[in-house]
Curated annotation (Swiss-Prot):
Post-translational modification, as annotated: Late in virus-infected cells, may be cleaved from a 56-kDa protein to a 53-kDa protein by a cellular caspase. This cleavage might be a marker for the onset of apoptosis in infected cells or have a specific function in virus host interaction.
UniProt xrefs under Pfam families: Flu_NP
Intervals of motif Bipartite nuclear localization signal: 198-216
Keyword line: Capsid protein, Helical capsid protein, Host nucleus, Host-virus interaction, Ribonucleoprotein, RNA-binding, Viral nucleoprotein, Viral penetration into host nucleus, Virion, Virus entry into host cell
Gene expressing this chain: NP
Protein name in the entry: Nucleoprotein
Residue segments, region Disordered: 1-21
UniProt-annotated location(s): Virion; Host nucleus
Self-association state and partner proteins as the record states: Homomultimerizes to form the nucleocapsid. May bind host exportin-1/XPO1. Binds to viral genomic RNA. Protein-RNA contacts are mediated by a combination of electrostatic interactions between positively charged residues and the phosphate backbone and planar interactions between aromatic side chains and bases.
Species per Swiss-Prot/TrEMBL record: Influenza A virus (strain A/Wilson-Smith/1933 H1N1)
GO MF annotation list: RNA binding; structural molecule activity
Biological processes annotated in GO: negative stranded viral RNA replication; symbiont entry into host cell; viral penetration into host nucleus
Length: 498
């Protein structure tokens, strides 16, 4: 870990703040949430949505996407310079669903980006409020993480699909800032770096000239983000090697794959935040709740509290199970796609099942789907307990490895043994220990071999009753470690396609 003095809390990253005390952080995060809520209320008014329609998660996603697109400067510039047929670069829109004569109807809306920007700024006291935009990006990213597997993307970059637990935040745009970087998994960073290295191998000019200099700066910055996620000296030294390489190529590619695999046991620090859809914040603001005055945290009890008192609806396709749709959204809300299902089940108070057993597709409805047969139902997003979200991935006991499972990345700071399939993981480490990183590789393998599942990943942390807002009396659950705890285990989830 970097020294405590240099680490900013998520909330500071979230609000681009200087060092702030806890109260100031809670206030600035609250301000951000309040801004999203006010924007959402205004959009619902503009679109003349009923209360029920405004609480429909599909409408929320469209409205969130419109404002993100309105502020996507690079893409807007690109669209203006490369006009494509039938696409107005100055407009943004999407499907809005309305209840008409007892049926759901889809209406495609189109707005001037300028108008959306005006409404957003007005809701945020005239500021661009980038933190609020990033917050919505992270919510979309968490929803993607819970909905799709990235098998194809993993295989394309030469990684093993079983490493999916390292892929948190893989659909986050690069422009998501420090808050976005904090929630990206080790695999996501490795994948971004490998893509750069591959381009460099195929395109002689990639690292050259003025553009190449900028590319190089981006490459080193990504390496530094990755380095900050590792908790052992050997892993970090290896990232330094990758960063310092004059001409990144196959050796760096190999090192990165090795590092990604090592993270299955020597887990990296990846932030988790509960980012909720705008249709949760809007009604709360409308009911008179003042987020800035009351303060808010993305990693404490607040999101759980908010969800206890929220009504959110979703469109349901004919053969989908509403309870399963609820589980998908619950996991997305708490950034729990890669958490051990036993931990999630305990906190939620109902059994959380693996992705392959869910009878539900994603939340978004494609434009060619038949609306005639669409129903809607309430999403059950409440929980039995709450727990603090983690940013650490577990203790590495005195630089000894803490143990992972071939696919979990803890979301909640809850004491548990982490079962992991050492033979499967270690099988990936036979062979290649020569080359300039051989001593680091040897050390990393030694650390992994000495990792024991008994090394609990969070000493003494537990879950809390929803009435216990100060986290005073932890309840340490005991888990049945005999069965499989990963969400994408033996799975057939859909692939994510941009």
């Amino acid at each position: 870990m970097a020294t405590k003095g240099t680490k900013r809390s998520y909330e500071q990253m979230e609000t681009d703040g200087e060092r702030q005390n806890a109260t100031e952080i809670r206030a600035s995060v609250g301000k951000m949430i309040g801004g999203i809520g006010r924007f959402y209320i205004q959009m619902c008014t503009e679109l003349k949505l009923s209360d029920y329609e405004g609480r429909l998660i599909q409408n929320s996603l469209t409205i969130e996407r419109m404002v993100l697109s309105a502020f996507d400067e690079r893409r807007n510039k690109y669209l203006e310079e490369h006009p494509s047929a039938g696409k107005d670069p100055k407009k943004t829109g999407g499907p809005i669903y309305r209840r008409v004569d007892g049926k759901w109807m889809r209406e495609l809306i189109l707005y001037d980006k300028e108008e959306i920007r005006r409404i957003w700024r007005q809701a945020n006291n005239g500021d661009d409020a980038t933190a609020g935009l990033t917050h919505m990006m992270i919510w979309h990213s968490n929803l993607n993480d819970a909905t799709y597997q990235r098998t194809r993307a993993l295989v394309r970059t030469g990684m093993d699909p079983r490493m999916c637990s390292l892929m948190q935040g893989s659909t986050l745009p690069r422009r998501s800032g420090a808050a976005g970087a904090a929630v990206k998994g080790v695999g996501t960073m490795v994948m971004e770096l490998i893509r750069m290295i591959k381009r460099g191998i195929n395109d002689r000019n990639f690292w050259r000239g003025e553009n190449g200099r900028r590319t190089r700066i981006a490459y080193e910055r990504m390496c530094n983000i990755l380095k900050g996620k590792f908790q052992t000296a050997a892993q970090r030294a290896m990232v330094d090697q990758v960063r310092e390489s004059r001409n990144p190529g196959n050796a760096e590619f190999e090192d990165l794959i090795f590092l990604a695999r090592s993270a299955l046991i020597l887990r990296g620090s990846v932030a988790h935040k509960s980012c909720l859809p705008a249709c949760v914040y809007g009604p709360a603001v409308a009911s008179g709740y003042d987020f800035e005055r009351e303060g808010y945290s993305l990693v404490g009890i607040d999101p759980f509290r908010l969800l206890q008192n929220s009504q959110v609806y979703s469109l349901i396709r004919p053969n989908e199970n509403p309870a399963h749709k609820s589980q998908l959204v619950w996991m997305a809300c708490h950034s729990a796609a890669f958490e051990d299902l036993r931990v999630s089940s305990f906190i939620r108070g109902t059994k959380v099942v693996p992705r392959g057993k869910l009878s539900t597709r994603g939340v978004q409805i494609a434009s060619n789907e038949n609306m005639e047969t669409m129903e809607s139902s309430t999403l059950e997003l409440r929980s039995r307990y709450w727990a603090i979200r983690t940013r650490s991935g577990g203790n590495t006991n005195q630089q000894r490895a803490s143990s992972g499972q071939i696919s979990i990345q803890p979301t909640f700071s809850v004491q548990r043994n982490l079962p992991f399939d050492r033979p499967t993981i270690m099988a990936a480490f036979t062979g290649n220990t020569e080359g300039r990183t051989s001593d680091m590789r040897t050390e990393i393998i030694r650390l992994m071999e000495s990792a024991r599942p008994e090394d609990v990943s969070f000493q003494g942390r537990g879950v809390f009753e929803l009435s216990d807002e100060k986290a005073a009396s932890p309840i340490v659950p005991s888990f049945d470690m005999s069965n499989e705890g990963s969400y994408f285990f033996g799975d057939n989830a859909e692939e994510y396609d941009n």
